A protein has these predicted regions:
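A nucleotide- and high-energy phosphate-metabolite-utilizing enzyme signature
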Residues: 1-173
């Protein structure tokens, strides 16, 4: 991120190109850290078969327009049945499994480094905001959008993109 900022300040790169580069770097971080976190989590709790984590990016990341000071607006979802149970040595129900996994993913993305947090992560755009669960099923998300979401929440969806999850689910969402 520092190198992109230097290029911008020195006028060696177009601001829109730097913004896209910040976004691409953040997406790689989301994908790599999420995959590593899932692998570690599955070692303890197994998998919930037929279910996967999906991460939506909203705001500047969703629109591929990050700046050096942007946070990551993320909504975490899971596919499959919420009542399913993981198959690990310490099994968890589907909803609990994905909420704990989501907490770890957010923690990995916001880990403290020598220069501060890797990324500031904002999850308040999830269904029901801070009053809602950190990670909800895709079906619950769709129902919330149809029945309860405010107009501004629908507007926020115009910049939303799937940045982590299976390609078929990304297309469906």
């Amino acid at each position: 991120r520092f190198a992109f900022g230097v290029q911008l300040i020195e006028g060696r790169q177009d601001p829109l190109d730097v913004s896209l580069a910040y976004s691409q770097l953040a997406e790689v971080a989301v994908r790599k850290l999420t995959a590593a976190t899932i692998a570690e989590f599955e070692a303890a709790h197994g998998k919930v078969h037929g279910s996967e984590l999906v991460i939506l990016a909203y705001g500047r990341l969703g629109g591929q327009a990050l700046t050096h000071a942007s946070d990551l607006d993320l909504v975490l979802l899971f596919t499959g049945e919420s009542g399913a149970e993981s198959d690990g040595r310490r099994p968890l129900g589907g909803t609990l499994y994905f909420n704990r996994l989501a907490q770890r993913v957010v923690g990995a993305l916001s880990v403290q480094t020598g220069t501060g947090a890797l990324y500031e992560v904002d999850t308040r755009l999830r269904p029901s905001g801070t009053q809602g669960m950190l990670c909800v099923s895709v079906d619950s998300f769709a129902k919330y959008q149809r029945e309860e979401a405010w107009a501004w929440e629908h507007m926020a969806l115009t910049r939303a993109r799937v940045v982590y999850g299976p390609a078929d689910e990304a297309e469906a969402i």
